[in-house]
Amino acid sequence: MTAFNPSSVRPGGLPTTIPEYLEHLRRSLAGADPALVQDALYDAEEYLRSELSENPGKSEADVIVSVAGSYGAPDEVADIYRDTEVKVQSALRAPAPKPRRSWMGHFFGVIAEPRTYGALFYMLLSLATGIFYFTWVVTGISLSAGLAVLIIGVPFVILYFGSIRVLSLVEGRIVETMLGERMPRRPLYSSRGQPLLKRIGELFIDPRIWATQLYFLFMLPLGIVYFTVVVTCLTVSLALIGTPVGLLLGFGSTLSIDDWNLGINGQPWIWPIAMLVGVLLLFVTLHIARGVGYLHALLAKHMLVKSAQYD
């Protein structure tokens, strides 16, 4: 990472190189969400390098000066991104639930929170995504290692590592949509001004690439656990709630669980107890989903966002 050098800043406060501009912008966004910082840096570098390529006769310093009025100085851009982020999050965020004072309100109020169902669906979806991610990484690593000694293996390895960045962005969008955690909306910028070999080398030494692959490998066991817990808890709770009603309506005569039978002519006093246990288990399942969603969002944020670059 390029260190900020005050001597490369013009008297007017504008940096003279694109890396210095990005470093200034990064420092201006200190304390902001790492995902927001990644998006801001990507947009700024994309814009500045596009302007530089369209004006080959200008230096980086001249380009920065020429776009200062339209795009803005680093401090101005940082303020714009902070303000925009507040507005966007306010528009996208679900209405905050009314504060609940009693423990019963906290316990049963989870059913009215949209994030509960987002986390629930994510836990169900994670089995499919976990299988896909795990298969993709294992296959990609195996083929990359096997083909690396061949000429055709080099472009395959590059393509595979590039696909990891794309899948990381896709998973981030899923996490933000379902779990509510702010994730990057832009990929990591691949500098077009660097030599090809250096850009290829950065793919292999980028710790976030390896962290993303590790995350994808984790997703298979996590997906199995998530899916199993949700399906089991929902099935048992809904069965306990619905079976007494079904028995009363004539749908069957007995519910058997191991050696325990809940039947029409058996012990009808157990019916309300079974329904109560089913309702409680259902709400416990919703709380588990909320907790798992919160923890998994933190895991995804830590492993998929290049936060170390912005500390």
Regions found by a protein language model. Name each.
Residues 2-39, 50, 54-61:
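A composition-biased, non-transmembrane "mature-region" signal
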Residues 3-6, 53, 57-122, 183-206:
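Cytosolic juxtamembrane regions of integral membrane proteins
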Residues 40-51, 68-69:
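Amphipathic alpha-helical segments that form the core helices of the histone-fold
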Residues 110-141, 174, 200-234, 241, ...:
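Short, structured motif recognition centered on aromatic/hydrophobic residues
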Residues 143-180, 279-287:
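Hydrophobic alpha-helical membrane-embedded segments
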Residues 173-200, 252, 301-311:
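Juxtamembrane inter-helical linkers in multi-pass membrane proteins
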Residues 242-266:
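Membrane-interfacial helical/loop segments at transmembrane boundaries in membrane proteins
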Residues 263-271, 283-311:
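Cytosolic/matrix-facing juxtamembrane and C-terminal tails of multi-pass cellular membrane proteins
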